[in-house]
From Swiss-Prot:
Organism: Teredinibacter turnerae (strain ATCC 39867 / T7901)
SUPFAM superfamilies per the UniProt record, alphabetical: Acyl-CoA N-acyltransferases (Nat) (SSF55729)
Family: Belongs to the R-transferase family. Bpt subfamily.
Keyword Disulfide bond set for record: no
EC number assigned by the record: 2.3.2.29
PANTHER family reported in the protein's UniProt record: ARGININE-TRNA-PROTEIN TRANSFERASE 1, ARGINYL-TRNA--PROTEIN TRANSFERASE 1
Protein name: Aspartate/glutamate leucyltransferase
Catalysed reaction equations from the record: N-terminal L-glutamyl-[protein] + L-leucyl-tRNA(Leu) = N-terminal L-leucyl-L-glutamyl-[protein] + tRNA(Leu) + H(+); N-terminal L-aspartyl-[protein] + L-leucyl-tRNA(Leu) = N-terminal L-leucyl-L-aspartyl-[protein] + tRNA(Leu) + H(+)
Length: 243
């Protein structure tokens, strides 16, 4: 019996959906006492699971299948015209990789981002305990990409997990005053290039929901696949747009 088959799953009670109004959601969690390692989490990611801190979950709503796992085919990705403009605009940034963001500089940026951009969400107000519990994991797969300008000002932080067959974009937060740089987009483009350089075929972007406009950006990175009926399927972009 594989490690995956031995895992216990627990379902939450129905609760208000974070993405669709007037909808209730149910979430399945992996047993929090289970031993998770890089290999097992990579396998779980291939089945559409994500993490919040060290808690591994997947939507499991009885009457709704709107949350569709999506991953970009990094090895065949080519930036489009607007993405090339974004790369050019941010060519002055210096990116460094770290194994921790347990410092005041990074937390201050996170706090500003949450308080100014997501004051209507369940992560507001930001605090250090929630910051650590949400972004970090215990499995040694997480890296933090810090984006700085020529004055060494910290403009953005991207949290990324290294899987066996790709990278997983966990979260990105950035300076709200640098909105014109499109730093969220730039962070994804940077991670796609990192995946390609590391010969990893995919960049996992979490869930895509057609009716949720804040998730529209995930289909801007092509080609991509979606997990449909437990199979990763290459998506015809024109069919997604027309539906």
């Amino acid at each position: 019996m594989t490690k995956l088959a031995q895992l216990k799953l627990y379902a939450t009670r129905p609760h208000p959906c974070s993405y669709l109004d007037d909808q209730e959601a149910t979430t399945v969690f992996i047993d929090p006492n289970a031993t998770i390692d890089a290999s097992l989490y990579s396998e779980l990611s291939a089945y559409g699971f994500r993490r919040s801190g060290s808690h591994v979950y997947r939507p499991h709503c009885e009457q709704c299948q709107a949350c569709i796992p999506i991953r970009v085919c990094a090895d065949s990705f080519t930036p489009n015209r607007s993405q090339k403009r974004c790369l050019k605009l941010n060519a002055d940034l210096v990116v460094s990789e770290h194994d921790s963001i347990d410092n005041e500089e990074c937390f201050s940026l996170y706090e500003r981002y949450i308080n100014e951009r997501h004051s209507d969400g369940d992560m507001y107000p930001a605090d250090k305990t929630q910051y650590r519990d949400f972004l970090t994991s215990e499995w040694g797969i997480t890296r933090f990409l810090l984006f700085r300008d020529a004055q060494q000002s910290l403009l953005a932080v991207a949290v990324v997990d290294r899987l066996e067959n790709g990278l997983s974009a966990v979260y990105t937060f950035f300076d709200p005053d640098a909105e014109k740089r499109s730093l969220g987009r730039f962070a994804i483009l940077y991670q796609l290039e990192q995946a390609k350089q590391q010969q990893l075929p995919y960049l996992y972007l979490g869930y895509w929901i057609r009716a949720c406009t804040k998730m529209n950006y995930k289909t801007d990175y092509q080609p991509y696949q979606m997990l449909i009926n437990q199979n990763w399927v290459n998506i015809d972009v024109s069919s997604v747009i027309k539906r």
